[in-house]
């Protein structure tokens, strides 16, 4: 009886929390030093966000008054791209499926170099607040509003929905509290500094968070890799299929994670926030290589986890469990803070971008074209709350939040990729009719195929959406009465 009481008391304390998902009584080994590092870090992020508060104008709040320098731009691009969802997802996916991440990393490098060479400078010269604004400048307000709606939902799924799960997992492991309570605590912290600071605060917290992120991931990879016996220990212990490429899985992963980068609203908002076009371009090119190196490290950790952890561990908990189990005191706190840094930097950025879609692409474009600057800031802040709380709500209520993210990215990319890229780079005639029909048709086909699990030639639904969108766009535009040459700069 006394032992039962003692066990109950242990479960209620931080340092005696039990990992129920393993169904084993293994204690979390977070020391006082680890806790001090984590708490100081979390409070510091709120403090940095508050200190850099800027909401004097919409340009201040949404794009940092277009004054971000090279170092801050590079750090915020990296911290956002290699977010908690990307890290935990990459580690977990490698743990489950082996080297399937390799083609994705290569394609991401190519896409990031393309964005740096051909997109970043052009977007900064054009200027704006959101990616769907490019649709509005070329095809008209209805296309911008529809694109803004698609983009806002995509931002909600990628940011608060996915990242609240990652942060909730961390807090659950550390505190032993219910995971949903952890998700609520984490989202409250992120909302606090995002609402108060806007892009300046988000970018500066990203700057600090990237330092933690890079250092923590590097340390964690080195120690976990060594613990697994190095590459020879990994290759001799993991199942043979983990070292064989699943082509179908790789294609699906590339389509789901790489194609959205081409029209990612969060990425475009960074271009608009740079102090000049050269800064936007160089920071994007610089960020491309370390992003891929961080993803390679996550791949190594995932393979090492196959050696070090049980085979039935949920993939979303693999990264955090590695940190808790195999790192020494102090370094453990640093690396957990790094994981939280990755999560928070992605969540805040995507919330701000989604909120800007609401205020710029929907509210000002469709509801109140005469909105004042002050009204725009207020609507953007309300949008941050809406995107954050809706994303958290989806994560709390739905059994599979990944489905929400997949559907939103499928609709956004399937419908908007072709008209947006042609609007930016195409020199021929452009048509409102062709663009709108292709956006609706491509998005609808992609959604229908995804919901009904329709697979042709092993390709994911997003590819069907892009193909249908392209056929409609280039099939209708030459014959549309409203087709004309449009300068995107106007």
What are these regions (language model features)?
Residues 9, 14-15, 215, 299:
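Intrinsic disorder/low-complexity segments
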Residues 10-28:
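Short, Lys/Arg-enriched N-terminal segments with co-localized hydrophobic residues
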Residues 26-490:
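Membrane-embedded helix-loop-helix hairpins and adjacent transmembrane boundary segments
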């Amino acid at each position: 009886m006394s032992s039962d009481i003692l066990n109950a008391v242990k479960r209620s304390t931080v340092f005696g929390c039990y990992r129920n998902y393993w169904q084993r009584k293994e204690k979390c080994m977070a020391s006082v030093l680890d806790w001090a590092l984590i708490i100081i870090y979390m409070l510091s992020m709120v403090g940095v966000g508050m200190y850099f508060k800027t909401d004097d104008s919409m340009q201040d709040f949404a794009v940092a008054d277009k004054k971000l320098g090279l170092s801050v731009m590079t750090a915020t691009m990296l911290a956002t791209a290699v977010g908690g969802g990307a890290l935990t997802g990459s580690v977990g996916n490698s743990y489950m499926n082996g080297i399937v991440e390799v083609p994705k990393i290569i394609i991401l490098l190519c896409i990031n170099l393309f964005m740096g060479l051909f997109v970043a400078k052009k977007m900064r010269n054009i200027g704006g607040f959101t990616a769907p604004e490019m649709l509005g400048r070329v095809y008209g307000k209805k296309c911008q509003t529809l694109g803004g709606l698609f983009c806002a939902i995509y931002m909600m799924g990628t940011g608060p929905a996915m990242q609240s799960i990652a942060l909730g997992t961390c807090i659950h492991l550390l505190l032993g509290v219910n995971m949903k309570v952890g998700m609520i605590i984490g989202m409250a912290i992120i909302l606090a500094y995002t609402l108060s600071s806007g892009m300046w605060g988000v970018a500066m917290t990203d700057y600090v968070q990237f330092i933690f992120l890079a250092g923590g991931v590097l340390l964690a990879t080195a120690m976990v890799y060594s613990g697994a016996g190095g590459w020879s220990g990994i290759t001799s212990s993991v199942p043979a299929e983990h070292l064989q490429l699943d082509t179908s899985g790789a294609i699906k992963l590339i389509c789901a994670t790489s194609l959205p980068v081409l029209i990612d609203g969060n990425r475009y908002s960074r271009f608009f926030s740079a102090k000049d076009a050269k800064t936007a371009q160089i920071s994007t090119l610089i960020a491309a290589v370390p992003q891929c190196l961080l993803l390679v490290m996550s791949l190594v950790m995932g393979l090492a986890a196959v050696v070090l952890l049980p085979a039935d561990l949920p993939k979303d908990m693999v990264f955090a469990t590695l940190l808790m189990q195999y790192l020494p005191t102090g370094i453990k706190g640093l690396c957990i803070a790094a994981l939280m840094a990755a999560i928070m930097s992605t969540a805040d950025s995507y919330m701000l971008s989604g909120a800007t879609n609401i205020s710029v692409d929907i509210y000002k474009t469709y509801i109140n074209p005469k909105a004042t600057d002050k009204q725009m800031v207020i609507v953007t802040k309300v949008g941050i709350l809406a995107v954050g709380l809706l994303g958290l709500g989806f994560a709390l209520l739905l059994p599979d939040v990944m489905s929400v993210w997949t559907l939103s990215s499928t609709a956004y990319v399937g419908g908007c990729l072709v008209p947006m890229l042609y609007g930016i780079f195409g020199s021929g005639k452009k048509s409102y009719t062709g663009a709108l029909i292709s956006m609706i048709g491509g998005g609808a086909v992609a959604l229908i195929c995804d919901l009904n699990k329709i697979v042709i030639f092993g390709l994911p639904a997003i590819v069907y959406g892009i193909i249908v969108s392209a056929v409609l766009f280039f099939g209708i535009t030459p014959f549309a009465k409203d087709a004309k040459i449009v300068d995107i700069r106007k």
